[in-house]
């Protein structure tokens, strides 16, 4: 059992002051202290009934004790002689068992599924016992209700909602519907009543027995509004009246509610089977029924409006991604396909969710994420309610209850709990939107002209004329018509169901009206149809674009601006979800928040599911790349900020990959034993090149080297003991594998580790001492140049400090100016001969004379040349800040440094935009002449003339 957090330990002293002498602190177990600190409801209950605590300590709650509820309750009711006694015993029994459930739940003695089962069965036991006692009492008073054949007629109770599904909350009201089988009259009583009168009176007394507050509290708040005609309808209906109502007037929301309906008590009797058979055709249609989506969407819209109207913030049931949305997701499939798939006719959510996955209606990943989210949310909800036995789904705002929930949910503090909660609810919302979406787009009347429908549906030939394309050139008009015709032919080759074609027929006129209004219609349409070809068999994505006009507009504008984005969306259509929220689409994650967002994103994936972990990493990266590119296109991110975001994203990925690899290696071999007396992992990842210099582009690979500080004699401490240095080698190999494994979402990054000591011939991971020795005694000048742009991107503080010291020492070595100048210049000339532009009359922005690499070589040369005299030059690893340092330390004139900085950022900006256009990094020879002349002059000054 986890110790109480500091705030709860302080609160325990307040609890001690409330406890009677009979419950002295020294007599209480650690478990009792924890539960009493967590729940005021349990506190109040055991103060009033100390024997309950004794019972809990001697007979702790068990997962299967719900099987004994009925026997225990019958014993409690055995001496009850009147209604007041019945009410008292029901309330005391309910409170005693709820204390036991709260105890088990708080200490996590049983699973959440078991808690839900116990809560539901307790309610059913109390309802049925009350009904049976009252039925006997009413029969003694008014006679037994019978049908025309003289057969006794029972009261059947339908438990609705979570009660029916076996998923009741800790503090829940109960939704009931009362019914009796056949008309008739009472027999054997002092006066005759017809059955409707008998069951109405009995129903009223049953509600009073359960619902009316007394000095002992109440059993359950009873809600009868789900019955036919609601509050204006009869309290109890005959089977015939129920059947007439649901056949003639039953509404979609009532179908939705009836999915979970369960007969309380004897569910296998003749009348129970008759009622169940009567209701099934109303709930589960024989045909696949897609109409329910709009009905559920309307219901969700009503709930969303109520949430806004009542200001229900932080509501884990009704809020976006909350419990209600998971229920909606599951019941969409039940209502659409339940009539054809018996597996989907379960009342309980979790078995139905498993059936949905087994039938491949949702991906296993989505289904598992929903399952985990549901159990997380239900545990949080039940814990929240068990604090005061209060019906609430709103997260607390006070520090005490936040500390209670964080502790009980096994989190260090409230921010960690809310971080995990956000991750779960975000994932639920994603699946919900894919299936159901919002109701707003459907409330707007269709306004497209018939001409756009004709353009899509009539398959016009390229020589046909249509007024909607009149603004395009002849060539563009023919291209557009040809592309539409080709796209339709491609669709004929695909397996697209009726729903998919229906959605396409709704989507395409909208899409064409937006695309063809553009001057670049032909280019944009070619990019979007390539994307659509990839998703036409996945109706969910088509529906997303069809039902969210804003998402469609973002798609069109982004694809028009960048073929790179169009290609990315075509390869990974999951990214289409990102189009739903322009607030996040055009505003990338804060640079210092990538690690935290990624951590939250990965919480939705089981830690031991390596395949899904790899997918999640790649999907997160792609979504973030899309946001960065969208902001770049929109002009909200300058080039320096684009690279900052790409670099922070890469660092977050490196951190997550190392964490995964480390966990896998430690699970297999244990930790190297030299770590036992220190913090950290004795491991560092050093970024070189663009990563080290904060200058990553959209398709940049990562130049990495791996360092460790493991002694020669270290071994791992696991069952499969291996040499400590071998452990770090396997760790580095595992990291490379996690980066390069190709999944359905591609690879994470290309990683180049050849900058390590001795290059490809050297060990993949190097000891810190060997790295320092190599740099001092064997490294070439070009390797010292590379060190200028190197920095630790992952590593414990000791190893980071060691690397920084080695880097500073190497860079501040005294060097003979002429020799250094010659070596740097010759290396640049070799590179230019090997990598320079092979295209005549073109300028390679990076590799040609006057380009980016020349600027990088100038800064590297000057750092190596003057750092011995000016050690501050070693501070930064990026070119822009190095140029600032050169000016600040009087090595380079400020005007020259600023001019080189402008040239450098201008050229890099062009490279970014060429990447967005999927174009190579060369331009016309007459481009950037001023920048190139400036760089050439600086090169001549520093690397030729001195």
Curated annotation (Swiss-Prot):
User: InterPro entries per the record?
Assistant: GlnE (IPR023057), GlnE_rpt_dom (IPR005190), NT_sf (IPR043519), PII_UdlTrfase/GS_AdlTrfase (IPR013546)
Cofactor(s), by name: Mg(2+)
Q: Which reaction does it catalyse?
A: [glutamine synthetase]-O(4)-(5'-adenylyl)-L-tyrosine + phosphate = [glutamine synthetase]-L-tyrosine + ADP; [glutamine synthetase]-L-tyrosine + ATP = [glutamine synthetase]-O(4)-(5'-adenylyl)-L-tyrosine + diphosphate
Region ranges (Adenylyl removase): 1-440
Q: Name one Pfam family in it.
A: GlnE
Q: Which GO terms describe its cellular component?
A: cytosol
Checking Gene3D superfamilies in the record gives: 1.20.120.1510, Beta Polymerase, domain 2, Glutamine synthase adenylyltransferase GlnE, Nucleotidyltransferases domain 2
CDD domains found in the cross-reference section: NT_GlnE_GlnD_like
Q: What biological processes does GO assign it? A: regulation of glutamine family amino acid metabolic process
Q: List its EC numbers.
A: 2.7.7.89, 2.7.7.42
User: Which terms are listed as keywords in the entry?
Assistant: ATP-binding, Magnesium, Multifunctional enzyme, Nucleotide-binding, Nucleotidyltransferase, Transferase
In alphabetical order, the GO MF annotations are: [glutamate-ammonia-ligase] adenylyltransferase activity; [glutamine synthetase]-adenylyl-L-tyrosine phosphorylase activity; ATP binding; magnesium ion binding
Q: Please list where the region (Adenylyl transferase) is annotated.
A: 449-946
Q: Please give the NCBIfam families that the UniProt record associates with this protein.
A: PRK11072.1
Q: Which HAMAP family match?
A: GlnE (MF_00802)
Task of the protein: Involved in the regulation of glutamine synthetase GlnA, a key enzyme in the process to assimilate ammonia. When cellular nitrogen levels are high, the C-terminal adenylyl transferase (AT) inactivates GlnA by covalent transfer of an adenylyl group from ATP to specific tyrosine residue of GlnA, thus reducing its activity. Conversely, when nitrogen levels are low, the N-terminal adenylyl removase (AR) activates GlnA by removing the adenylyl group by phosphorolysis, increasing its activity.
| Family designation | Belongs to the GlnE family.
Protein name, per record: Bifunctional glutamine synthetase adenylyltransferase/adenylyl-removing enzyme
Say which species the protein is native to: Shigella flexneri
